[in-house]
């Protein structure tokens, strides 16, 4: 039996002073020893016979009546006479019997003519007196525990019940209502049975007490100590009997009864649930099995009922006369209906159904584990992507594109839902916090806020935008899986009345939240702003930095687009070429263009007339014919800069990892490409010394340097050098070129137990992680300040060093055979323009 049923029976027993015997162990031992004596047993049996003797019982009642009469109380003993018995269930779990008995001490039923107020029909209104005895425990035919109640009427009422079915039903309803009202229990009215019994158990008399109408003279004498007690209120007149009103509407009797049931969650002891792992307590709230217990006190076996079990419900149905049950129960978990078990306890009349719960599949559990790991992980500043690996060594052009694609995916703005201002934005039942640290930067008409709150859920970001203010709320999940709610309200200062918010973007990162407020074009750049938890708690904060990129871009574009003046000077004795580069005016450009054709013709005639000597040929083998080809590239770049002045452009200082460098034999016309150390065509025109030194010849090729950065035109790789064939004796030795190698040796060590491709992917993954960590540390709001301060500092340092160590005119640089494009000065466009103003290549031994 369930605990609730036991508590209800105990409560009912206490109300009727029918508690179980409570004795100590010492008293129990003494009684046990006494019953072991034959003399005591004989005396005890004599006492029982004396009590059960009707004559002695009559004498006992007369003595009790006389004693109560002396106290001014009239006592009447009611001896119930058998009538008929009602069998039903008590609270849906215990069998009970109600004895409908009769006694002459009860008043006769009375009736009077009355009209039904609902229908207007005339009829008889009955008043049926009754008496109730205390409940008692008994046993049924199978020696099972049951409860017995007695309801006593006048014998005339029982006689009318036998003759009239309607009066009999009225008598039964009155008895059931009296038991439910007196003992606070629920009876099963749908399964009433009428066994062939006149009375259940042994009849026990009950007592009715009331004050005497004619007290004696002794009773009227005042008590000698009455003056010590407070004055008693005057006694009321003749007490009226308690009248229990009948129900105006009959209690609806259902066709089937819903049995009493309970659902228990069964768990097994699993030691893995007591560990500190993240997935240790995932299934703590999910039981191993469900145990459904259904109380069927009126059924003898399960053959009399039907039971259907599905994955989500249990259905019980019984049509047996006197035991009509119907139950449809929805289960809280999905169960395996084919692996369930059912057992019926005939002693307790209880049906127990055990159903194993279906756990989630391994795939769903793995997905849940990944979700929990994502919520509870600590931010390390590095984000891993399985799809970010790319073989850089094999495809150098794909590295930068892949990294840019990853960055664009990460920094995609979060689509935050926008609420209307009519509905309350912040929930009253949720406690919101203001971010402890935040800063603001202004870039033109964009205000960038950085809210330093880690692990923000992108789906939780909500915003309420107005003309001059914005309200933002979001939530985070900590290591304890408990959400923390934040709110941020920002408003433009009142000084700038024309300022208004045009659009809003909110981005959730691992360590912070970036909020962008795009102001209208008529808005002025604010120097401060108001921020707080809501509109009632605002505080003024200054803006960290203000930047105007558009004005700076115009100045930089003017400097970059300025024309350059390039001069070439040949020294035949030292075989040196002197290049001077400086900004020139438009007049100087026109003069140079007129003089260039004349100088080129004179120079070509001098070279063709003069033949090189043997020493000179040997010296030419060690020299580089680089300077004029590089200068020719610069000359070709001038018309491009002129065309770019006509078109507005916006440049951004982004770090570049690649550049295109030109070899010695670079062809500006995009002709056929020749490989390194290849002889010239036997039937084609052979280049002269002047062509190889002053122009870009046919055999041209391009090479790409991954390590170089910047856009300088002076980073070249030397390739496409022709090799003379032994059979071709007529080829001039002056066209031969040499290659110088760097002294630095690149070395790569591989482990014996790993493959080259495996280490290549590992190194590429490490480089990608460093690149992402660098981009993540510099958020969009702080990166602008960092780039501007860094660029200005580098510019000042280089100007100071250049003014102190180098002349303003021309500087001499020796070609060492090394690529200098990776130098720090090559990262800035300003440094490149100044490097062009002072440059010279000298060829010597």
From Swiss-Prot:
Protein name per its UniProtKB record: Protein kintoun
Any one GO MF annotation of this record: protein phosphatase 1 binding
Function, as annotated: Required for cytoplasmic pre-assembly of axonemal dyneins, thereby playing a central role in motility in cilia and flagella. Involved in pre-assembly of dynein arm complexes in the cytoplasm before intraflagellar transport loads them for the ciliary compartment.
Record's compositionally biased regions (Acidic residues): 391-400
HAMAP family for the chain: Kintoun
Compartments in which it is found: Cytoplasm
Segments of skewed composition (Polar residues): 640-671, 794-804
Native species: Drosophila erecta
Any one Gene Ontology BP term: cilium-dependent cell motility
Similarity comment text for this entry: Belongs to the PIH1 family. Kintoun subfamily.
Modified residues (Phosphoserine): 380, 779
A GO cellular-component term linked to this record: cytoplasm
UniProt key word Cytoplasm: yes
Annotated keywords: Cytoplasm, Phosphoprotein
Quaternary structure (record): Interacts with Pp1alpha-96A, Pp1-87B, Pp1-13C and flw.
Region (Disordered): 362-420, 575-691, 773-845
Biased composition range(s): Basic and acidic residues: 362-382, 584-593
InterPro entries per the UniProt record, alphabetical: Kintoun (IPR034727), PIH1/Kintoun_subfamily (IPR050734), PIH1_N (IPR012981), PIH1D1/2/3_CS-like (IPR041442)
Basic residues bias (residue ranges): 611-622
